[in-house]
């Protein structure tokens, strides 16, 4: 997605925020909403990684960890970052059985990647590498800042819309307040999804280039989708506005390209990756390498 389109989408979310502010407090409310939206963008610029990681219950994995699987995981991420020409990101783990992962940070120099314990336990080493290469692609494409700012505004719009029901009666009437309360979060969600869904395809392609085998990511996506259907991610459930940051929707496992899906269809993503593998002369399921005999087996 181009920079111009990203700014357009973020401007649309700010406009929604301002419209609700007008309903709640007239012109003064609209101006205040604009100031708050601008402040949230500035806050997200400097604190996006800390905010998201804290809300998702992520714990940093230090290089000297005694856990052999986590140590190998960190080494693999560092190797992938080197392949991509990126600084090694900080690495975090989220204690939840649902397999998933995300990246955050305002730029490659301040990036962080996080994986769930479910991801490391359910996927083999090549598949984990494919997932982390995808997340590093988001870092390289500088998607992480945009996605975090979008999540912040989307969550704030939902909360502000709820206030409209109680404070906007005199200005727009009860019916208008209810309409804003319903449709403003929906509009914010559509903007959020438009950002997420288009970027996932780009990150899939670049991630496959970083790890060297599109089939690793294709296989991982299929396993992650199955895991998302059967396992709950309590951190994502508590902050659904951040669902689009994960590699696969942590709130549901539906595989259709529906209007209110935060991610493209897994089947479509896998098909594109398999097509890419064919163009690279890679066929079948990649056999485990010698390094895969470690923690992942």
Swiss-Prot record:
GO molecular function: metalloendopeptidase activity; zinc ion binding
Membrane topology: Multi-pass membrane protein
Gene Ontology BP, a term: proteolysis
UniProt keyword annotation of rRNA processing present: no
Enzyme nomenclature, EC number: 3.4.24.-
Active site feature: 135
Family: Belongs to the peptidase M48B family.
Protein name: Protease HtpX homolog
Species classification: Bacteria, Pseudomonadati, Pseudomonadota, Alphaproteobacteria, Hyphomonadales
């Amino acid at each position: 997605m181009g920079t111009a389109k990203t700014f357009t989408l973020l401007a649309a979310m700010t406009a929604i925020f301002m419209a609700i502010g007008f309903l709640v407090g007239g012109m003064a409310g609209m101006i205040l909403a604009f100031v708050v939206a601008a402040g949230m963008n500035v806050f997200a610029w400097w604190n996006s990684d800390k905010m998201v990681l804290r809300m998702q219950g992520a714990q940093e994995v230090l290089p000297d960890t005694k856990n052999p699987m986590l140590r190998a995981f960190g080494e693999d991420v560092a190797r992938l970052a080197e392949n991509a020409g990126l600084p090694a990101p900080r690495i975090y783990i989220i204690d939840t059985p649902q397999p998933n992962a995300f990246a955050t940070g305002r730029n490659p120099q301040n990036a962080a990647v996080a994986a769930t314990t479910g991801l490391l336990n359910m996927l083999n080493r090549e598949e984990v590498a494919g997932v982390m290469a995808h997340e590093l692609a988001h870092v390289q494409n500088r998607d992480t800042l945009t996605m975090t700012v979008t999540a912040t505004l989307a969550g704030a719009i939902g909360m502000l819309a709820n206030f409209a029901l109680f404070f906007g009666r005199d200005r727009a009437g009860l019916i208008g307040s209810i309409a804003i309360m319903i449709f403003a979060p929906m509009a914010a969600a559509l903007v959020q999804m438009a950002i997420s869904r288009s970027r996932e395809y780009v990150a899939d392609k670049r991630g496959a280039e970083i790890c060297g085998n599109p089939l690793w990511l294709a296989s991982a996506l299929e396993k992650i989708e199955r895991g998302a259907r059967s396992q709950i991610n309590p951190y994502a459930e508590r902050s659904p506005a951040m669902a689009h940051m994960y590699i696969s929707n942590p709130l549901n496992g539906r595989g259709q390209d529906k209007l209110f899906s935060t991610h493209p269809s897994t089947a479509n993503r896998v098909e594109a990756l398999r097509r890419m593998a064919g163009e690279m002369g890679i066929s079948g399921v990649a056999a485990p390498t010698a390094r895969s005999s470690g923690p992942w087996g």
